[in-house]
Swiss-Prot record:
Residue numbers on the Perinuclear space membrane side: 1-228
Pfam families on file: Herpes_U34
Family: Belongs to the herpesviridae NEC2 protein family.
Keywords, alphabetical: Host membrane, Host nucleus, Late protein, Membrane, Phosphoprotein, Transmembrane, Transmembrane helix
Assembly and interaction partners: Forms a heterohexameric complex with NEC1.
Topology of this chain in the membrane: Single-pass membrane protein
Protein name per its UniProtKB record: Nuclear egress protein 2
Positions in coiled-coil regions: none
Listed HAMAP family: HSV_NEC2
Mod. after translation: Phosphorylated.
Transmembrane feature ranges: 229-249
Superkingdom: Viruses
Nuclear side: 250-258
Length: 258
């Protein structure tokens, strides 16, 4: 007997995987299903030209219930419905052989389990089969199973290796970017230490003083060019001071001669 928690989990998983809205499915009542588990757990109205993850849902059901789940497609005349069973019902309306393209006329059914899907897959690993409903003619539909993925095991392994190498390359690039960012954000002392230069405060201060002394001859002409009036006043004052000093020396020389 299916537990209530498992019942709810199957319904929620089905809606999530197939991306169903409230109007897209009908659920069998819990009490009715517990009395007769041969009823379908839910009936789903499938849309045209929409890719449903059928293989993933079948494998999920089997993993949760440990039973061979079976989905039955039926042409109701105006659309295709899918009834989801925990296991094969006692009476199956038809015994169709599952192919990649299956034509369903009115009231015809197609029973599908996980083994049927795996039988038509081009490779057993790395391929997920999806189901697409298409209109064939007036009242007939096509149930098409499309495999997405490499067509051979060697292609699948090569694809995995390429993905892993690409992932490692991107991770190495990110690591180098983080290292460069941390180096830029380091204080001056740590930056100098990381590149093997002077690390003491005295050596850093000496380096700053040497830099200032080297720049001083260059900064004087720049200061004079930007402050013409002030420089002219200073030159005039300097000339006046020199004239006064020269005059004092001349007077003292005259007195000594007398």
């Amino acid at each position: 007997m299916l537990k209530e928690k498992m019942y709810d989990e199957l319904i929620l998983s089905t809606c999530r995987v197939l991306k169903l809205g409230p109007a897209d499915f009908r659920v069998t009542d819990k009490n009715l299903f517990s009395k007769n588990p041969k009823f379908p757990l839910c009936d789903i109205l499938l849309k045209l030209d929409f890719a449903y993850s059928l293989e993933y849902l079948l494998s999920l059901w089997e993993d949760l219930t440990k039973q061979e789940a079976r989905f039955i497609f039926k042409n109701t005349g105006g659309a295709v419905s899918m009834s989801c069973y925990l296991h094969a019902p006692i009476k199956q309306e038809s015994q169709n052989i599952v192919k990649e393209c299956n034509i369903l006329n009115v009231n015809e059914c197609l029973s599908v389990c996980l083994n049927d899907i795996e039988a038509i897959k081009p490779s057993s690993s790395g391929v997920l089969t999806k189901c697409i409903i298409r209109r064939n003619r007036d009242a007939a539909f096509i149930v098409e199973f499309v495999a997405f993925g490499p067509e051979s095991e060697s292609e699948y392994i090569a694809l995995l290796k390429a993905i892993i190498l690409k992932k490692k390359f991107l991770e190495r690039q990110d690591l180098e970017k983080h290292r460069a960012a941390r180096h830029i954000k380091k204080p001056l002392r740590l930056q100098l230490k990381s590149v093997g230069e002077m690390t003491s405060f005295r050596s850093i201060n000496y380096m700053g003083n040497t830099k200032d002394a080297a720049v001083f001859p260059v900064t004087v002409p720049i200061f004079a060019r930007r402050n013409n009036i002030l420089c002219g006043f200073l030159v005039a004052a300097l000339l006046i001071v020199c004239y006064v000093i020269f005059k004092e020396f001349a007077l003292s020389a005259d007195f000594s001669a007398v």
